[in-house]
Regions:
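Bacterial N-terminal signal peptides
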Residues: 2-15
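Short, low-complexity N-terminal intrinsically disordered segments enriched in polar/charged residues
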Residues: 17-50, 54, 62
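Short beta-strand segments enriched in hydrophobic/aromatic residues
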Residues: 52, 64, 121-123, 157-160
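A solvent-exposed, acidic/Ser-Thr-rich amphipathic alpha-helical stretch
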Residues: 57-122
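Short, cysteine-centered beta-strand-loop-beta hairpins and adjacent loop/turn segments enriched
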Residues: 95, 124-134, 163-164
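Short, surface-exposed coil-to-beta transition loops
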Residues: 101-103, 135-140
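Short beta-strand edge/turn micro-motifs at domain boundaries
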Residues: 116-118, 137-167
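Extended, polar beta-sheet/loop recognition surfaces of beta-rich domains
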Residues: 166-174
Length: 174
């Protein structure tokens, strides 16, 4: 009888340990997924600058969701085809003067198949004696969505901080 009670106790302990192990496995899988999502979103943010600087507006536009919106100092457009046409008209190409964007300070929050991101940008141009000069700097405020298994911009708002194109960031307002 004692062996039966001990065996029953061990069986009950194992039975309760299995859900805990599954829960830990599920938590680990969730954490790994969040890390992978964050890395894919960082790559999306960097590819935005890369395609913009290369004047590859087709690849650039494909970073946006089917109903994705780009909004900035030049206007607001919706949908990849409209974004591509807008950029081809607004930004001359090819990039013969070797200007480029530097992107930094990524803050990314993932929530399932949606995410938000905030980042900084600087636009660098050739200066006197062929030195690099920061001509503009600003921030991006992004809403992202997983579409067809890939992260895309649902909405990207580009704001200039220097020179200013509007009110200062909320953090600097009193």
């Amino acid at each position: 009888m004692t062996a039966f009670v001990i065996g029953l106790g061990i069986a009950l302990q194992l039975q309760t340990a299995v859900p805990a192990a599954q829960s830990a496995t599920e938590r680990l899988a969730s954490r790994i997924q969040r890390i992978e999502d964050t890395q894919e979103i960082e790559r999306l943010l960097l590819n935005y600058g890369r395609h913009l600087d290369a004047r590859d507006f087709k690849a650039y536009s494909l970073l946006f969701a089917k109903d994705g919106v780009w909004s900035g100092g030049m206007g607001t457009v919706q949908g990849p085809a409209a974004i591509q046409a807008f950029m081809e008209k607004a930004i001359p190409g090819p990039n013969a003067v070797h200007n480029y964007h530097v992107l930094s300070n990524f803050v990314i929050d993932v929530n399932g198949d949606t995410a938000t991101a905030w980042s900084r940008w600087q636009f660098v141009v050739p200066g006197p004696n062929n030195t690099a000069v920061v001509a503009q700097s600003g921030r991006y405020d992004d809403t992202l969505i997983r579409e067809d298994g890939r992260w895309k911009f649902k909405r990207r708002v580009a704001s200039n901080d220097i020179p200013s194109s509007g009110p200062p960031p909320v953090q600097l307002q009193k």
